[in-house]
């Protein structure tokens, strides 16, 4: 089994950019970024329960990581960067910490939560996500989306932006979204911070300037934060040009070493490059 995906810019011989969307999204939402990052080949993936992978279901994040590896193997992708937003960012971080990372060049995470520290926090989140999942299964999706985008993390959205998101997301399958929300809930996710801090892979944590919650989270967890100006939680959608500029700059720090295949150099180069970026 593998996920539905599409390849772009495959004539390039650099490592692939593998784009993982958030809950309620689909692979195609990354296309503006794919076009702006055309010096790398790109693979956009529809996650389980979403887009053309609506009928795919995973039981947890570990199975999701295995499915990601199977998809990459089927596409014959041997070297790749993971770029993930929100749920996609959590999947990417979990994969880097606990999955098969052969060929993984690095992580670019946008607003992904690295986990909840206490069991009580995880239990509360499980209840929260089960409630939303129940609504996605049983209520008209436009009604649920209208409430979903009233959550504090989306407070920077203008009314017209909120309505546009509802219009785009209303084609989702409620059961598919609900299954993914429950089975990959933040309440099931391990506390990834200690493992993330030990990674030798290049890693940057991207966050909108107006997304105070995730900026605070990144600083509290000592993640390598880089802010995108004048945008909130969904930075890549709000300002694709600025987001792509940061992505391209970060990748440019490592392009030559992959051309010359020097993995040992990457391990020593990364801290200095990150200091220059931030």
UniProtKB/Swiss-Prot annotation:
Entry keyword Lyase: yes
Gene3D superfamilies: alpha/beta hydrolase (3.40.50.1820)
Pfam short name (any one): Abhydrolase_6
Sorted UniProt keywords: Lyase, Menaquinone biosynthesis
InterPro entries the UniProt entry points to: AB_hydrolase_1, AB_hydrolase_fold, SHCHC_synthase_MenH
Family designation: Belongs to the AB hydrolase superfamily. MenH family.
Name of this protein: 2-succinyl-6-hydroxy-2,4-cyclohexadiene-1-carboxylate synthase
Lineage of origin: Bacteria, Pseudomonadati, Pseudomonadota, Gammaproteobacteria, Enterobacterales
């Amino acid at each position: 089994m593998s996920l539905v995906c599409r390849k772009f810019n495959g004539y390039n011989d650099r490592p692939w950019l593998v784009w993982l969307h958030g809950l309620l999204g689909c692979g195609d939402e990354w296309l503006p970024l794919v076009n702006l990052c055309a010096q790398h080949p790109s693979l956009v993936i529809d996650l389980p329960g979403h887009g053309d992978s609506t009928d795919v279901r995973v039981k947890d994040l570990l199975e999701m990581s295995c499915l990601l590896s199977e998809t990459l193997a089927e596409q014959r992708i041997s070297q790749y960067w993971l770029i993930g937003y929100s749920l996609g960012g959590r999947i990417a971080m979990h994969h880097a910490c606990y999955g098969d990372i052969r060929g993984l060049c690095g992580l670019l995470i946008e607003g992904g939560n690295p986990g909840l520290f206490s069991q009580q926090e995880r239990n509360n989140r499980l209840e929260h996500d089960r409630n939303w999942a129940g609504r996605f299964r049983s209520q008209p999706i436009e009604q649920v989306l209208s409430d979903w985008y009233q959550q504090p993390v989306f407070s920077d959205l203008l009314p017209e932006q909120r309505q546009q998101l509802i219009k785009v997301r209303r084609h989702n399958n409620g059961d598919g979204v609900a299954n993914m929300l429950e089975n990959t809930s933040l309440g099931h996710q391990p506390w990834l911070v200690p493992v993330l801090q030990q990674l030798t892979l290049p890693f940057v944590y991207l966050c909108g300037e107006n997304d105070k919650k995730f900026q605070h989270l990144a600083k509290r967890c000592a993640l390598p934060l880089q802010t995108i100006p004048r945008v909130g939680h969904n930075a890549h959608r709000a300002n694709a040009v600025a987001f792509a500029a940061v992505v391209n700059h970060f990748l440019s720090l490592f392009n030559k070493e992959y051309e010359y295949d020097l993995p040992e150099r990457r391990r020593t180069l990364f801290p200095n490059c990150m200091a220059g970026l931030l």
